[in-house]
Amino acid sequence: QNAKGGNGGSGGGGGRNGHPNNGGQGGSGNTPPVSPPQGNNGAAGAPNHPGPALGGGGGGAGSAGSGQTNGSGSANSITGSPVTYAEGGEGGNKGPGGAGPAGATNKGGGGNGGSTANGAGGNGGSGVVIITYRFQ
């Protein structure tokens, strides 16, 4: 069964693995559309035949998902050292296995896709608000 990945403000979800001949479509990342864009599209899932039936990677802040691979996040040094935020989640695998791992805590990462045996995707990671000010 094909399923389109969900749309997201900061990155589109990956498409579900295909059945039997085509994969599910990836979700749109910049929804609603704004400029500069707030995210990138998720990748389509791979078909069952002749492929491995993998879920598509979710889009991140820096790039779209591609195949099962997640989109990159965006690096920022507001805390004094570079930290990458808002990476997309990886696509799920075919076969046995558990639910997908959750996204990175305090970095707004996407949750990873689950296996076909237990298709539950992981929750997205919590975000963080950082406020800077100049003390005089």
Residue ranges, per PLM feature:
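Low-complexity, glycine/proline-biased repetitive segments and flexible coils/loops
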Residues: 1-136
